[in-house]
């Protein structure tokens, strides 16, 4: 845009840079006091390792809009609009440096930045882009405030901030076009006078009788209007959710690079406070999450707890924590030992919502700005259990059983080896040199329905002539339920006991049928020094099938809808192997659970310790998932997890369809297809 003339005797560039300096001063003051100072109250955290990997991810997430666009393949095209606005905004930011600030200092375009041809091309691009963005902004307004999809229907997502920003950006686009138009109308020449839309409008204004003097005045008005909007935007950002434009790239850089399924390790010996009960107990990355949050509602819209009528809203957890931090910000210092504790679980975040979380990771998967909700929620759950001894009664019963019996199945009548009766399965005590440890797990060993899964696995291993053994009575719970229910202390006791036992037998390779055991041993035992090669059965059996070690031959005539376990799929990226096993079964027709499959799979309701925590609000999560299964019209829902088998079977039974539909582990169907 061609700048107007000087302001009387005052050179234009002086006015521009004085106003810019003032706006930047206000921005930096607010940014420090409303963001930096508050975030630095948090505890130190990792995030400075593997810089190239971090930078690559941050660029893809922020500049590339990777997570925003990932939903397009599922038919959600809102991300295209957001990415267009974002990339357009970046383009205009570049143009401000060239056309507004640098040009105002020279009274014309600084030729050393671009050649005349470059200016012409770039001006045409900005002219067309301004029109495109104006259309996209109208669509964004209609979508958010008229059509209003479910994820944008919250008071938080309909806040006036978003409307103000849309109006400001629209003002930038219109003022760009009109500045060009009135430059043409006053007889201006050069590359900026040749832009398509601006030239057409300028000629139209001339035809309407707008004179050179009026056009000159209006060109100055819209040029200054454009600059004013830029300055207002600069000052306004630190006070709104649009701080995420600056916080999101930083947040993405410092995202966790640890396995998705691993909760952060707690050093019990050197930790004064267990979990997080006030702002200062969180890490600075967890506090930064609140500023990175775009309040888009994607996390809450994906949350199975929220979708079934529970209190939990991941978006509100993050935003309420940030708002609480800002509200008490006048007390905050980097080392605030003197600050009176202000509990976040008293009126800020409800305890019920903390216990609603299933640890399924759907919120993290959907978040476009690398907010990590689950560790934050789990730190509050740890605080409730370890600092305040608070938990639902059903959770307390399971934790007590874990502590007393080494498993959560209170009241079971089975021993660790009853499931193997008649199968002649050796223990490591009997066969210490076995190549593979088959980790049975509490549920397949001690819960009647799930014992069929363990038996199927043993039959398949024998058919493939795998050199394996089990721990038998030496096996105890991996500790996953304890950790997911907030008792980190009990988790570490159980985990260390298992690590010591396996190291005593020099175990190298572990195969398990339970994704929760798999995730814990693979991703969390290394935190305690337990380093083993851990495979889920689907990975191991898929290899056996490909090598020809087992050959399914019996026709099964089953139409199976496959349900992805959260701890196998989202947390560990194991999607293809279970499907590979299913496809190898003769006569099995595999179908997907609509759009709720793979990384967008819907939790069965058992994660986060909820296998043993009773649901008291809304629809049961497993019933909602059962409804999704029934929509496929398959006769069987296939899973790769003993928890999922139980939850889906109960859902089918609750709907009175257990004579028509069934829930089975893929492993069971595979075993039935073998000639044993």
PLM segments and residue spans:
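Membrane-interfacial helical/loop segments at transmembrane boundaries in membrane proteins
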Residues: 1-4, 103-121, 182-218
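Juxtamembrane inter-helical linkers in multi-pass membrane proteins
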Residues: 38-63, 149-163, 191-204, 246-274, ...
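Ferredoxin-type iron-sulfur electron-transfer modules and their immediate structural context
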Residues: 191-193, 220, 234-357, 405
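Iron-sulfur-cluster electron-transfer modules
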Residues: 2-139, 146, 281-290, 312-316, ...
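Hydrophobic alpha-helical membrane-insertion segments
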Residues: 83-95, 164-188
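Juxtamembrane/interface segments at transmembrane-helix termini
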Residues: 27-46, 101-106, 139-157, 178-193, ...
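Iron-sulfur cluster-binding electron-transfer modules in prokaryotic oxidoreductases
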Residues: 202-217, 264-274, 373-676
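Alpha-helical membrane-embedded segments
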Residues: 18-27, 133-137, 169-171, 216-253
């Amino acid at each position: 845009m061609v700048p107007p003339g000087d302001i009387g005797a005052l050179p234009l560039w002086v006015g521009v840079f004085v106003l810019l300096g003032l706006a930047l001063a206000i921005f930096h003051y607010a940014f420090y006091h409303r963001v930096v100072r508050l975030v630095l109250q948090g505890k130190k955290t990792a995030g400075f390792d593997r810089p190239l990997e971090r930078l690559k991810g941050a660029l893809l997430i922020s500049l590339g809009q990777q997570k925003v666009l990932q939903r397009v393949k599922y038919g959600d095209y809102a991300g295209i609009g957001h990415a267009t606005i974002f990339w357009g905004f970046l383009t205009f930011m570049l143009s401000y440096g060239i056309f507004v600030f640098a040009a105002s200092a020279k009274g014309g375009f600084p030729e050393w930045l671009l050649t005349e041809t470059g200016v012409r091309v770039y001006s045409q691009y900005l002219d067309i882009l301004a029109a495109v963005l104006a259309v996209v902004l109208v669509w964004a307004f209609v979508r958010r405030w008229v059509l209003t999809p479910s994820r944008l229907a919250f008071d938080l997502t309909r806040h006036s901030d978003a409307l103000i920003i849309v109006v400001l950006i629209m003002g930038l686009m219109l003022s760009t076009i009109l500045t060009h138009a009135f430059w043409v109308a006053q007889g201006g020449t050069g590359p900026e006078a040749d832009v398509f839309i601006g030239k057409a409008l300028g000629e139209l204004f001339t035809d309407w009788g707008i004179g050179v003097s009026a056009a000159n005045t209006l060109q100055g008005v819209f040029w200054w209007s454009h600059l004013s909007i830029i300055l207002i935007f600069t000052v306004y950002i630190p006070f709104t959710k649009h701080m995420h434009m600056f916080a999101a790239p930083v947040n993405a850089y410092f995202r966790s690079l640890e396995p998705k399924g691993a909760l952060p390790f707690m050093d019990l010996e050197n930790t004064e406070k267990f979990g997080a009960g006030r702002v200062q107990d969180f890490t600075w990355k967890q506090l930064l999450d609140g500023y990175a949050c775009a309040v888009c509602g994607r996390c809450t819209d994906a949350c199975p707890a929220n979708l079934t009528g529970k209190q939990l809203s991941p978006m509100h957890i993050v935003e309420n924590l940030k708002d609480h931090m800002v509200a008490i910000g006048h007390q905050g210092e980097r080392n605030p030992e003197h600050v009176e504790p202000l509990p976040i679980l008293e009126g800020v975040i409800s305890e019920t919502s903390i216990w609603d979380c299933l640890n399924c990771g759907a919120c993290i998967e959907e978040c476009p700005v690398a907010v990590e909700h689950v560790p934050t929620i789990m730190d509050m759950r740890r605080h409730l259990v370890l600092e305040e001894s608070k938990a639902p009664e059903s959770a307390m019963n399971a934790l007590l059983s874990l502590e007393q019996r080494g498993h959560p199945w209170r009241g079971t009548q089975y021993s660790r080896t009853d499931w193997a009766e008649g199968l002649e399965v050796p223990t490591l005590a009997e066969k210490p040199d076995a190549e593979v440890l088959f980790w049975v797990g509490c549920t397949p060993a001690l819960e009647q329905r799930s014992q069929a899964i363990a038996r199927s696995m043993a039959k398949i291993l024998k058919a493939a002539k795998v050199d394996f053994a089990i721990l038998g009575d030496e096996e105890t719970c991996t500790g996953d339920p304890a950790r997911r229910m907030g008792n980190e202390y009990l988790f570490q006791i159980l985990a260390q006991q298992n690590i010591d036992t396996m190291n005593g037998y020099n175990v190298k390779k572990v195969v398990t049928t339970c994704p929760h055991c798999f995730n814990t041993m693979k991703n969390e035992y290394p935190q305690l020094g337990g380093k083993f090669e851990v495979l889920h059965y689907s990975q191991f059996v898929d290899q056996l099938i490909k090598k020809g070690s087992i050959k399914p031959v019996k026709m099964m005539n089953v139409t199976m809808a496959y349900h992805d376990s959260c701890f196998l799929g989202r947390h560990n990226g194991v999607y293809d192997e279970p499907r590979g096993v299913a496809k190898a079964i003769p006569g099995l027709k595999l179908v997907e659970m609509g759009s709720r499959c793979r990384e967008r799979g819907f939790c069965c309701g058992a994660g986060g310790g909820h296998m043993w925590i009773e649901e008291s609000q809304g629809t049961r999560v497993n019933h909602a998932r059962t409804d999704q299964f029934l929509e496929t019209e398959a006769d069987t829902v296939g899973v790769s997890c003993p928890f999922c088998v139980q939850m889906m079977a109960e859902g089918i039974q609750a709907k009175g369809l257990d004579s028509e539909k069934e829930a089975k582990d893929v492993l069971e169907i595979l075993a039935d297809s073998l000639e044993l």
